[in-house]
């Protein structure tokens, strides 16, 4: 392996900007409707399907090329945490959590994973709508215990483990960024991809029907297709930079060894 590539701090940022530039090039060349169909079909588009192997590869890679140091117990716990988050990301990508919740309480949750309007209500009497993965769903007395337990488990397994990992590595990450550690910069690009996904997901609703983001008579606008492409591609980039950080860390720790 070329040390000038894998061991340089700027490897991940260069790759991040190259991927975003390629995405904008694809957006500029494709019709908005065709781009949306290629990137987003509720887990069944070609791009969404292509994203799954990247997340799936995280699990075997983190055990095969363990990126962590320390005792065997520490390495096992950290590898297990990474595996759990990767598996939960696959669950989210395939919308399996929505399917499971619909199966648990079909009277409250529709097949699309959204709350059925007019069934559950807020304390002020207004209908409870949107995703069931929020506090108001958990505190509603009409929701079955099994559904509440599933939502709590989902948050604990995904966001809980992920948040614990962020807190555990927060200080080493900040130090690594300022010391130009390549793994820290790969993790930073991982986080930047996550921010990209969240911004692209919420941007249309933030801007509402202004700035050309409303649906036109012809269908999807160019701005809407860009947001869709950024969101879906950002999810693939999350997996790519997770894989890069894992391999970089393993390689740097074992450089010079016969591995």
Regions found by a protein language model. Give the residues of each.
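N-terminal membrane topogenic signal
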Residues: 1-19
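Membrane-interface helix-boundary motifs at transmembrane edges
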Residues: 3-6, 64-78, 171-182
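Alpha-helical transmembrane segments of multi-pass membrane proteins
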Residues: 16-34, 198-201
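Short aromatic-rich membrane-water interface segments that cap or initiate transmembrane helices
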Residues: 41-49, 111-153, 220-233
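Hydrophobic cores of alpha-helical transmembrane segments in multi-pass inner/ER membrane proteins
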Residues: 50-64, 152-166, 233-249
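Alpha-helical transmembrane segments of multi-pass integral membrane proteins
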Residues: 74, 78-88, 176-205
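Transmembrane alpha-helix/helix-exit interface in multi-pass inner-membrane proteins
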Residues: 89-107
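C-terminal transmembrane-bundle signature of multipass membrane proteins
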Residues: 194-259
């Amino acid at each position: 392996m070329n040390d000038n590539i894998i061991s340089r701090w700027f490897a991940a940022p260069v790759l991040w900007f190259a991927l975003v530039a390629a995405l904008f090039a694809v957006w500029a060349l494709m019709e908005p409707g065709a781009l949306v169909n290629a990137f987003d079909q509720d887990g069944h588009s070609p791009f969404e399907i292509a994203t799954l192997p990247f997340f799936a590869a995280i699990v075997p890679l983190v055990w095969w090329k363990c990126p962590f140091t320390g005792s065997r117990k520490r390495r096992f716990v950290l590898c297990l945490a990474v595996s759990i988050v990767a598996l939960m990301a696959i669950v989210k990508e395939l919308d399996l959590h929505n399917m499971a919740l619909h199966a648990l309480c079909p009277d409250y949750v529709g097949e699309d994973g959204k709350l059925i309007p007019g069934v559950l209500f807020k304390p002020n009497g207004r209908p409870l709508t949107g995703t069931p993965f929020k506090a108001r769903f958990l505190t509603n007395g009409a929701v079955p215990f099994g559904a509440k337990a599933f939502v709590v488990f989902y948050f604990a397994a995904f966001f809980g483990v992920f948040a614990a990992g962020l807190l555990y590595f927060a200080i080493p990450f900040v130090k690594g960024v300022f010391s130009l550690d390549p793994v820290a910069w790969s993790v930073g690009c991982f986080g930047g991809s996550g921010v990209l996904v969240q911004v692209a997901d919420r941007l249309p609703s933030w801007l509402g029907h202004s700035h050309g983001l409303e649906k036109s008579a012809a269908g999807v606008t160019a701005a809407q297709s860009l947001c869709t492409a950024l969101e879906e591609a950002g999810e693939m980039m999350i997996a790519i930079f997770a894989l890069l950080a894992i391999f970089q860390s393993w390689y740097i720790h074992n450089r010079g060894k016969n591995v």
